[in-house]
Amino acid sequence: MEEWVEKYRPKSLNDVAGHNKTKETLIEWIESFVSGQKQKPILLAGPPGSGKTTLAYAIAKDYAYDVIELNASDKRNKDVISQVVGTAATSKSITGRRTLIVLDEVDGLSGNDDRGGVAEIIKVLKTAENPVILTANDVYKPALMTLRNNVNLINVGSVHTNSIPPVLRKIALKEGFEIDEKVIKTIASHAGGDLRAAINDLQSLATGGSLEVEDAKELPDRDSEKSIFDAMRIIMKTTHYDIATSATRDVKEELGTIEEWISENLPKEYLKYKDLANGYDYLSKSDVFLGRVFRRQYFGLWRYASALMTAGTALAKEEKYRGFTRYAPPSIFTKLSRTKGTRQKMKDILKKIALKTHTSTKRARNTLDYMVVIFESNPEVSAELVEYYELTKEEMEFLTNKTITKNIFSVIAGKKPKVEKEIPKKKKTEEVMPIIPKRPKISELPKEPLKEVIETIEKSVENADTKEKEKKDPKKQATLDSFF
């Protein structure tokens, strides 16, 4: 299937939305070449989807120039640039027409595959007879400092959100789709000024048969996720190691998340079984290294995991796949979002079981499996378990169903009245007045209590003295009793 971005790319500057000042500058620049006046190459700098490449192709079409392009998915080292760009910069095309050279995303030049690329570009620019247009997302990278001194820099801003709906409406009409205006506006608002992303989103929704407002609302916010989409495009389309490994360098996502993205989109891109099998083989090896990083806390393995998931999957295919591919966020994220409430309920139940059994929630899961079997077969025992673990009616319906839950709670309800009747009886028996000893009257006391007490004390002292003498008597043989 042909990409709508390419199919409906403006053929003329008049068809390009916005960028009026930039278009005027480009027209003056190209007309200087037409009149035989050599000009400095132009570097168009701006965010992805702002129309940099489209502007270059549109002006080439308007002035009948053939285009030779090298982009981020191509190898762009010193030799390639010298052979392809160097030759084209000083000669006419095979049709006899002059050539416009487009070097796309020059800020992506890096690694061994692009070694010497920037230096060779500068060399070619100084001797170029034909017009050269370069594009870059981040023109202020240190590697491009010398390059900036050899070009005329033009900043291309993002497409205004209000300029996107007319373009989408026009494309939808030509493709025969009737789309609600709310859907078009939702797509435009999610694009974040990236017209290319908006067109891709429109094609994704249209070809997927989901043109409702709710479907459009689920589109990723390109302001935060456009980098990951660009990375997917480069990894899936390129066959060069360094280009693939550098694709995720500026992506603000964790390596595990990038792995999920690649896993989700591999079957969408790799149509040959052999390529798909090789791609997943490299991805599985990446997952092994990623697991070792987290288990052993040895982050030196991080680079191997990254290389295997990017360059490994990129080089797994025998050749590049052409045409449009609908890349999508990992479905696991959508499933996790939808099941968030369910997982929270399960988490709460496992916490209750873990608290009572003095185990972890992981082990509590094993206990829960047996409990569910009991719930389905024995209401009486189930009632005791429910009371012990303090499970609610809602939690029981989540674990079983309404019928089983109703039976168990009816057993619990049948027990409660008996317990309530016994409690008052127990309270009555417990509330008995304490026995208070009767206080004797003064007339009943002994007449001479003091004399009796003194006699008792004297007898005790005499007995104690006698025992002490027996212990000290050396003639008397000591027995065990003497030690007590």
Curated annotation (Swiss-Prot):
Domain of life: Archaea
Annotated spans, Disordered: 463-484
Biased composition (Basic and acidic residues): 463-478
GO molecular function: ATP binding; ATP hydrolysis activity; DNA clamp loader activity
Alphabetically ordered keywords of this record: ATP-binding, DNA replication, Nucleotide-binding
Subunit field text: Heteromultimer composed of small subunits (RfcS) and large subunits (RfcL).
Free-text function comment from the UniProt entry: Part of the RFC clamp loader complex which loads the PCNA sliding clamp onto DNA.
NCBIfam families: PRK04195.1-5, PRK04195.1-6
Protein name per Swiss-Prot or TrEMBL: Replication factor C large subunit
Source organism (scientific name): Methanococcus maripaludis (strain C6 / ATCC BAA-1332)
